[in-house]
């Protein structure tokens, strides 16, 4: 999770890119410490930012000093539970500041999961390699919105993180005759391993 992180060192950026490309998940929150120029010039070309960042929108001095998420029926697995307001009304959060994004409608690897009433993207997802990146346009504390003050914030965050982890962590519960899947670093491909169990010992190669 990058929560209002200004920049990363080159070595960190390289490691993060490899992690996501190999199936890891990355969650990015905005905020006042985020270096917009660095994100656009470094994180975006590395494939780790769903869209170019624009200016920071600020409604604090407007007659209505906030916007909200658009009420909708979510079909995304991480948000589907919130289609029922009894599980948490996402539209009740007041968003005062957020990063505007410049979306590319032709990029099939990026999709908006939630929007604000202004039309700006609130939550964007990008598929990168075998992994996923989620970008939330506001901060994860209460500096820019009332999101963390709402009862649904903890399950909302947990759902997002669980979804991101699901691409790299196969289910531990298997049905009868279902194949067991385990992920290993790419540089171990082709190495021989021993699979042991109650009734069988078998050598196989990782692919």
Segments the model singles out, each with a brief description of its role:
Residues 1-207:
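N-linked glycosylation sequons
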């Amino acid at each position: 999770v990058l929560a209002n992180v200004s920049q990363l060192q080159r070595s960190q950026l390289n490691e993060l890119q490899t992690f996501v490309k190999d199936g890891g998940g990355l969650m990015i929150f905005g905020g006042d410490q985020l270096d917009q120029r660095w994100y656009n010039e470094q994180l975006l070309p590395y494939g780790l930012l769903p869209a170019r960042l624009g200016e920071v929108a600020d409604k604090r001095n407007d007659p209505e000093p906030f916007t909200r998420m658009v009420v909708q029926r979510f079909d995304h697995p991480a948000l589907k539970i919130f289609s029922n307001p009894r599980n948490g009304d996402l539209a009740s959060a007041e968003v005062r500041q957020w990063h505007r994004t410049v979306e590319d409608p032709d990029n099939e690897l990026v999709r908006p999961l939630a929007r604000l009433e202004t039309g700006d993207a609130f939550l964007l997802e990008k598929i990168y390699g075998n992994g996923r990146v989620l970008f939330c346009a506001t901060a994860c504390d209460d500096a820019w919105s009332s999101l963390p003050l709402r009862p649904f914030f903890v399950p909302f965050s947990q759902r997002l993180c669980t979804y991101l982890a699901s691409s790299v962590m196969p289910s531990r519960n298997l049905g009868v005759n279902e194949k067991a899947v385990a992920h290993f670093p790419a540089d171990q491909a082709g190495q021989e391993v021993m699979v042991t169990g109650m009734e069988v010992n078998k050598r196989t190669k990782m692919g």
